[in-house]
Amino acid sequence: MAEEPRAPEALSSTFMLNMTSDASVRRIVRRIGTLARRRVQQLPDMETFSPEFDPELSEPPFLPFSAYVITGTAGAGKSTSVSCLHHTMDCLVTGATTVAAQNLSQTLRAYCPTVYSAFGFKSRHINMTQRVSSHGRSTDAALEELQRRDLAKYWPVLSDIAAEFRRTKPRGLYSGVSGPAFEVLRDMHQGQLWTTNVIVVDEAGTLSVHILTAVVFCYWFFNAWLRTPLYRRGRIPCIVCVGSPTQTDAFQSSFSHETQVNKIRECDNILTFLVGNPRAATYVDVARNWALFINNKRCTDVQFGHLMKTLEYGLELSPDILAYVDRFVVPRAAIMDPAQYVGWTRLFLSHAEVKTFLTTLHATLKTAGQGRAARGTGGDGGGVTMFTCPVECEVFLDPLAQYKTLVGLPGLTAHTWLQKNYARLGNYSQFADQDMVPVGTEQDEERVKVTYNVTYVKHSSVSVNCKTKKSICGYTGTFGDFMDTLEADSFVEAHGHEQPEYVYSFLARLIYGGIYAFSHGGHSLCENGEYVAELGAVPLPGRTWDPEVTAGMELGELPLEVAWDGERSPAAVFYARVLAPPAANSAPLCSLLNIYNDLRAYFRQCLDVAVRYGGREFRDLPFCTFTNNMLIRDNIEFTSDEPLLHGLLDYASTTENYTLLGYTHLNVFFGIRGKQQPQDAGSSRMPRLMVKDEAGFVCCLEHNTNKLYETIEDKSLNLCSIRDYGISSKLAMTIAKAQGLSLNKVAICFGSHRNIKPGHVYVALSRARHSNCVVMDRNPLSEMITGEGNPASGYIVDALKNSRALLVY
């Protein structure tokens, strides 16, 4: 009898919510396409912006632009529209922050720069002082005056970018290139401001208004200088601004060199400017060019979604909503107790609170470890291992002497400068939150070097702060998970797009080294004679390998100093007869693929034998393998008899969770594949951190080096260099840093802060994936006055009533 067809499984709520957005997202794409085709009749005269020009003193031409605004509640699917834009039209997708940019890169599987990188911003521009303009100060100032104000304010940076562009790009480079030929050239390279007029900016609510003007200026200047078809046709730039004006704020810092004080103040962000300024809103026709995403699709809890919409739109906080939020409140002592809510991310409002919590956590773990040691039950803090690594900060004396003369502070010493600028350095190099104490000072004729010790917890979750290189050198997990990864080819898909030969060579090395675990993995099957016999009967790989390849392979290329105890174990036979996989640059891709497939098949057969004798439970046994013969000293230091750690190069993602495993002093490849990067001067005492990614692969992280420049009277002085590890603990972070991240479980501590904004509550709550994964020490919403909130909420409510605005459910 024929089997009846099975009823289709019910579709998930998340899938249904995403599908309801499909038609509206298509409308967004069509509308942006229409804006992208707009042209200007009178081209702006970019010759005005000569090296001698100053918009504060002379009136610049108006630079036309169009804009499309995409806002919505947290997790509502705004990035869905960005993905559709990326796949359906030529556009430059950028993020306002590094986290936003790498989040987009991960989602789109394509490189997405920050908006600052897109218009040519470099590290030397960070400390260039922004000017105060006398233009555009009145409340009814025209858009031309507002644009001139922003140009004058940011002109020290923009003029330097323009000067560098003139030096590095030939003038009129594309003047003789036709439109079709230019499109071919454009498709061969990554998007730039001179290859497309559609620029997408994610998390635009964190950017000050002058960044919008900077993007528009650089678009017109770059295209005019190169004489691209975009400029010759008069194509107007279309800036697609994505984010939430109620979730985020833009801040501007100003540093006084005379007092050595850094002041930070809030300023208008791009989204609020476009939807709230009457002249800007009219110019870009925001009523027609605005899409609002309504439903939270990250967390499908109806009440939680209603809370998000209430905060997004600044609606009245009803007693029911306040009672719902009260459900999340727990005693503050419970949140501050490291022994409770283990594995949850603590969120605070200030860096000082984060640092205090981490210091308390480390002290608690250390005390627990000492107690266990005194009782003779182990001294690792209950299974927790802590370690310290040095961080180096160098102040250069010659630039400091010039700086003191220029700012009129002859008595300023290196130690005083470092003390007064420590907060700036911490934020600059992203180590402000860490449990770090000074341990030593060295001085010579050129520099003063201060060394700090930063404390880390093994197996804690960390995130990467910046664009950091990683060398993938091993795997740790289970036998079954490793086999599933090989079978699914997920690693190859994620890393093998540019140079797959390196990926296959790397995986072949891991499999080759991992065969040892079947015979000497410390499991009970090692003593089973029948298992050992059948494992030894598995046909060895390598018989079909290309003779030209195997001729260049030598035994011991991948040294595995294993004590065989005089036995001819299956592993001993394997390593005696099967040659180590060749390096990626010494064999053709087809041969490397053949070797990888043979080794993978052999590993699968060995695992099948182990499962037959050990049951399905064998798949869950611990398994680890490395490209080197790795030893772990004191449970924390990765070392090897080889001086160089072999690995696969890639960039670490700021949006991915990494588990901290320890550190290594081995030399590591971080330069071009096949070439060793020279050791940084002065970094010999700094180890490199070892982490595990979400898939189980072990990576070695490159050091993070930042150089702090001060620009005084057109002189750029490199005063300081900071070398750290470029990571932050996910045990605790500020609410501002959490913006754009999806955290599994969050414990929020608002402390005794006053004047907490609804946006703080909004961002903190919306980081969780489920309403059951949120706790906080108090409910700030119950303390807020009715109607208090972000002014942008009023503009959003007006848009909801506007039939021309697009609502995406």
Curated annotation (Swiss-Prot):
Record's keyword annotation contains Cell cycle: no
UniProt binding sites for ATP: 72-79
Cellular location(s): Host nucleus
Signal peptide: none
Pfam families to which the protein is assigned, alphabetical: Herpes_Helicase
Keyword annotations of the record: ATP-binding, DNA replication, Helicase, Host nucleus, Hydrolase, Nucleotide-binding
GO molecular function: ATP binding; helicase activity; hydrolase activity
Protein family (similarity comment): Belongs to the herpesviridae helicase family.
Function (record text): Component of the helicase/primase complex. Unwinds the DNA at the replication forks and generates single-stranded DNA for both leading and lagging strand synthesis. The primase synthesizes short RNA primers on the lagging strand that the polymerase elongates using dNTPs. Possesses helicase-like motifs and therefore may act as the helicase subunit of the complex.
Protein name, per record: DNA replication helicase
Organism of origin: Epstein-Barr virus (strain B95-8)
